[in-house]
Amino acid sequence: MSEQTLRSEMLLGSDALARLRRSRVAVLGLGGVGSWCAEALARAGVGALTLVDEDTVSESNINRQCCALHSTIGLPKAEVMAARVRDINPGIAVDARTERYEAATRERFFDTEYDYIADCIDLVACKVDLICTAHARGIPIVSALGTGNKADASRFELCDISRTSGCPFARVMRRELRSAGITHHAVVFSPEPAMTPEALCAPPPGRRSVPGSLPWVPASAGLLMAQKIVLDLCAAQEAQI
């Protein structure tokens, strides 16, 4: 018994922890949601992680992303998170990919077998392609919906996308997935109405605005994703945590 995972084993059991150690999970998008999801998966004892993000750490990420420190500004998020999870669990197998998941890179990404996928991608087209491919291949997947311009972390819930309402991003995703023949899909979602942020910076190319974000909001969504993944992999959804 490893002392590092002792507290988890007390609730989940040794067989469940062994299943986690044999599991590979992919986390796509390592921002405010995905970085915390990856961190929790590593701390829970998942044996292998594939970490995917094309971006580098910027100063504006520091308020909400666990990969973002002054010492990591300018470094690839995938590499920073890979180093972080190796420090958490030296025995973990990590595949860090500094690239964008999209239709053009799909086959390269799926050259590995995954037990679960955490979809923390922001771009609709890339997100839809990933979800459709995972469903077609029978790979369990959970997706994060909108976390920007929200303040109440307690409103987040795990649910089927068909049960979402009041979230513009969820509405777009429901429409796009319906068009692809998918009506049921696991998501982390908040019905909290979006706040209107003060425009303090210019949006990057291709975006109409920059959403505001608070430290605890995307982190809570990422931790809920990790909860679902770990408990599903352990087949221990009824664990008291």
What are these language model-derived features?
Residues R97-R106:
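Conserved SAM/SAH-binding loop
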Residues F110-E113, V124-C126, A136, I141, ...:
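Glycine-rich phosphate/adenylate-binding loop
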Residues R43-A48, A136:
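Conserved S-adenosyl-L-methionine
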Residues V46-N89:
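Glycine-rich phosphate-binding loop and adjoining beta1-alpha1-beta2 segment
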